[in-house]
Structure formats: C-alpha cells, structure tokens
Amino acid sequence: MTGASYTVKSVETIAEGSDVRARLYTLAAGDVIPWHYHTAVTDWYFCLAGSLRVETRAPRADRLVQVGGSYKIAPKAAHRISNGDAGEDCRFLLLQGVGAYDFNKIAE
C-alpha cells in the first residue's frame, strides 16, 4: 500500500471525517513511514501486534511500543515510524485529530 510518499504492507481506513480519522496499518520488516510532521493533528498510536518503533526529533527519542502500548505525538513534532521487530509484522491503530490532515515530509 502506497501512502503520501512511502510504501507499507497494508493500510485500512476504519473511519474518516473532516477533522478525525482512524486507520489500521500493517508494517512488514523494513517498512518505514519516513520523517514527517502534521500541522494540526495529534497522532495516537496503539500497538496491536509485533512492536512499533517511534522516533522523534524534538525531543530526540527512540521508543519501542509493545502490544497493548500506546504513544502520542503532538502537532508539528517531527516523527518517523517503523516496524520494531524484523521477525514479524507490526500492526497498529492510528487515530488522528482533531484538525485538517496533512503529511509534511522532511529531510532524513
């Protein structure tokens, strides 16, 4: 499945409105959602299977979210998402809102 400027194993839109959306992602080993930020929306990640790696720049952090865990990223915070386990797929629910969605890619 091809996203704004990346490819991952699958993305399923669960619900989408003018200012909120819910999507179910599956990332295979090596799948990466590149560095980006959102102008208005907050991202909430909920790990459902495998492990999810969440990297941020300000503050610089590298977190591994396990099954049952969650992580919040505020608007304008640069972040990169990847599969945290080369041995199995990572599945996560992403809730985004409240505000207009955008995907602003930034340099690696």
Regions found by a protein language model. Name each.
Residues 33, 42, 71, 79, ...:
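Glycine-centered loop/turn positions within well-structured domains
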Residues 44, 72, 87-104:
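A short hydrophobic beta-strand segment most commonly corresponding to one strand
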Residues 18-19, 40, 59, 86-88:
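Short strand-connecting beta-turns/loops that link adjacent beta-strands
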Residues 59-76:
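Short acidic-glycine-tyrosine-enriched beta hairpin
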Residues 27, 38-54, 95-97:
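Short, conserved beta-strand element in jelly-roll/cupin
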